[in-house]
């Protein structure tokens, strides 16, 4: 299972409109940042000028790494033999500081999103992570879904998925991350991909890459998948295979990445950071760079699903801060698009470190990291489960409605939990007293899991706001650091 979408920026050919709400459906830089920042599930940055529509030449005899009981993954025939030899990666588009988008695509834009926001005062969803199946060929120790191989009852049918897409596009044209489980284990995935394209949404795929063959990579390109996200948690096979609970997984994943790149599909590597691998993060970044991928995103563990069984491996707050500080400095020189995810603290940290360097966090200097915020669950992001439950993110274990019973658009608009998450003034504890709350917000899923209250203070934050300590008022603290407590600075 792969759990991670990124952002766009620092590209001279990336034209972003200044205002949201113009007649042509363009969106502002802030809206684009929120669309492409992602949250919680399978974040996949969208590359500019993607070549994903150009299928590569492939061998007709490519074999499938494993058979699947209810039909081969992605509808690709083949036996249980392994991956072909490594295939060199093709040319890649590089992005830095913020996300990228495919040419001509404006996630969340268009008249429907404009009309929706004008009518309701609520932003339309810019990105939706959709667990199209919970079945998975791996049993990763941190999996938020505790996914396993085999059949899951009640999964949305193709017709139900299409009906939900039809409803979604009445209010937005979002990026839809097809995730799982392992989405390539769903035989009708290409019909889902094509239908998303047809209706004006942008499908991307979060995969563990072990099931990718030359044929599947070619299908990704043929069906215009601009990018996939793939999880790699260790720089070598021993640690990665243990974390993913599957011997040989590392080599299969690397082979899958190379085949996707050879087919012209963009690749993003995601790494879940725990006490097991925090000391190896530089080596994992170097591996990503050596594979010539497009992006490297680090994910901070959220202890849900099987992840709750390794709670002791979640980084303590001080180590959490160290990793995010490393990320701030490393992204300055990384050739990859580099972004922490499930780490809302990062948007506080970049402002603190920038101030120490005598800089202001602006789009010109920091790209779309300056335009987005940490937690976007219920604000411009949400999650759809394999059975149709709607959640703020995949880690937020609270079902706010089900698309089998109620249209997605109504749940997005009417859910009390969603509306609570949109109101920063409701945050409690030190998060409520924090001058950075409108750019960070804390991880609401962690708050729910640890405290039972999604509005409580982020449990894994080391920062002590001056207003919380009684040293000054919230407004005074916010003015001192130059941020708003009600919206983006």
Language-model features: locations:
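Short, small/polar residue-rich loop motifs at catalytic or cofactor-binding pockets
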Residues: 375-379
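Conserved alpha-helical substructure of the radical SAM core
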Residues: 2-4, 8-12, 17, 34, ...
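Short Fe-S-cluster ligation motifs
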Residues: 167-180, 458-489
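N-terminal [4Fe-4S]-dependent radical SAM core
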Residues: 2-129, 366-369, 477
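C-terminal accessory region of radical SAM enzymes
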Residues: 2, 318-364, 389-441
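Radical SAM/AdoMet-radical enzyme domain recognition
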Residues: 158-179, 185-316
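Short, acidic, Ser/Thr-enriched surface-loop or helix-capping motifs
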Residues: 290, 384-385
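Cysteine-cluster motifs in flexible loop/terminal segments that predominantly coordinate metals
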Residues: 427-472
């Amino acid at each position: 299972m792969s759990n991670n979408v990124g952002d766009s920026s620092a590209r001279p050919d990336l034209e972003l409109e200044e205002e949201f709400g113009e007649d042509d459906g363009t969106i502002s830089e802030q809206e684009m940042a929120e669309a492409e920042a992602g949250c919680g599930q399978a974040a996949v940055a969208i590359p500019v000028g993607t070549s994903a529509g150009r299928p590569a030449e492939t061998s007709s005899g490519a074999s499938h790494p494993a058979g699947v009981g209810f039909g081969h993954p992605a509808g690709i025939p083949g036996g249980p033999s392994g991956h072909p030899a490594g295939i060199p990666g093709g040319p890649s588009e590089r992005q830095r500081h913020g996300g990228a988008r495919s040419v001509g695509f404006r996630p969340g834009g268009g008249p429907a999103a404009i009309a929706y926001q004008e009518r309701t005062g609520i932003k339309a969803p810019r990105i939706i992570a959709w667990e199209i199946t919970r079945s998975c060929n791996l049993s990763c120790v941190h999996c938020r879904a505790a996914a396993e191989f085999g059949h899951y009852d009640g999964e949305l049918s193709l017709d139900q998925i299409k009906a939900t897409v039809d409803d979604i596009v009445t209010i937005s044209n979002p990026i839809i991350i097809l995730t799982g489980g392992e989405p390539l284990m769903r035989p009708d995935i290409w019909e889902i991909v094509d239908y998303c394209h047809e209706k004006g949404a942008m499908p991307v795929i979060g995969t563990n890459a072990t099931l990718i063959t030359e044929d599947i990579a070619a299908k990704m390109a043929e069906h215009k998948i601009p990018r996939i996200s793939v999880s790699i948690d260790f720089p070598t096979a021993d640690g990665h295979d243990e974390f993913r609970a599957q011997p040989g997984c590392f080599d299969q994943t690397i082979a899958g990445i190379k085949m996707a790149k050879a087919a012209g599909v963009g690749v993003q590597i995601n790494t879940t950071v725990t006490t097991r691998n925090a000391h190896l993060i530089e080596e994992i970044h170097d591996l990503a760079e050596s594979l010539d991928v497009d992006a490297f995103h680090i994910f901070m563990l959220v202890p849900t699903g099987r992840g709750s069984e390794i709670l002791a491996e979640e980084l303590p707050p001080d180590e959490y801060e160290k990793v995010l500080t490393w990320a701030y400095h490393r992204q300055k020189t990384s050739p990859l698009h580099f972004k922490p995810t499930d780490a809302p603290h990062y948007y506080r940290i970049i402002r603190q470190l920038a101030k120490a360097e005598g800089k202001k966090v602006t789009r010109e200097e920091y790209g779309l990291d300056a335009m987005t915020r940490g937690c976007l669950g219920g604000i411009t992001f949400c999650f759809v489960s394999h059975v149709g439950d709607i959640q703020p993110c995949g880690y937020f274990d609270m079902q706010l409605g089900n698309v089998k019973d109620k249209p997605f658009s109504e749940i997005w608009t009417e859910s009390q939990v969603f509306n609570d998450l949109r109101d920063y003034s409701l945050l409690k504890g030190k998060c409520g007293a924090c001058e950075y709350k409108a750019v960070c917000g804390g991880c609401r899923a962690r708050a729910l899991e640890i405290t039972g209250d999604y509005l409580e203070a982020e449990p894994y934050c080391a920062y002590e706001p001056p207003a919380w300590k009684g040293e000054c008022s919230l407004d005074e603290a916010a003015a001192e650091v130059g941020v708003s407590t009600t919206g983006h600075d």
